[in-house]
Amino acid sequence: MRDMGEAAVETLLGAVRLPMKKLVDTSLQTRPDVALYEHATSSLYTVKAVVVLPPYDVLELLALLDMRSTESFRHTMRILLDGVFVDGAVLHATPPSSPHSAESMTLNWLAVQNAKVHLPNRDYVFLKYGNCYALCGQCSPRRPAFMPTTSSTPSRPLKDTVAVSVWESVDVTECGPLPNDLNTLRLHFRQTGYVLEYMPRSRDASHGICISFFMSEEVPSSRSVSSLGKAWVVRMAQSVANLHHALVHQYVAEGRQRQLDMPRPMKPTAASRCHCCSKRFSILRRRHPCHLCSELVCKRCLDKQFQVDLCATCRLPSSMSLFKYWAS
């Protein structure tokens, strides 16, 4: 499985360098915050969806995409594939190859809706393999110019790090296609997954994280992708825009769990100033509690973007920290 995952990573990183053309199709529903590109071969139609997030640590996003339990897989995929997700499960989870490796390897089953309601649902059995790599001058026969980054090594410049989470379908004897009466069609993921790269604003500063989500559709020989198949691929690819929401949601959920495990003293309810900007509260400047740290802040210092009230301090990318599966 590890060799298959590493080979799939090589294929996906190769797709990053493919000359893709911008997808322009007025018949498709597209999101203004997602840049779409397409590439077609005789057997595969691929869409790359690109979004830019604030400068989070790529290891936090890799931890989010690990999902090594069925509960976390269903919870995260329900947010990512909003309106498309049907069901899913983690069939097997393998621990990282070393105590300090960010390697993630799970075997998953996923069912999603098709392009139209009357069409059978789609389901996939696939290997989800993720890791974080450092760009370097050395070459390896398997991954030229890429080497795994471990927490035991000194931190490298942000621009020299890339994280990958790839989905590659596998044939598992014990997980054959579902019965016909369930109206579900078994298909395959090929050249599918996330590539996370830092976007440098200048030589020494990071501007954000560029996330590319590749989604592909197998095409029968001597045919082009159907309009329904193309619509489905585009809809799935655009789900990358929900990654920010999923990250914040997981961050808040883990923060609340830590508060239950280690309760902190209650904050004074009569604080006279905003915890973030230090402006004095008044009739016009009301108190609002942060749902994570419980500090009292004014409305201007409160972020309700993801239906969760977070103060300006908690919503900073540098404050974002998730449980690391490789550190357990």
Show where each model-derived region lies.
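Eukaryotic helix-grip
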Residues: 1-328
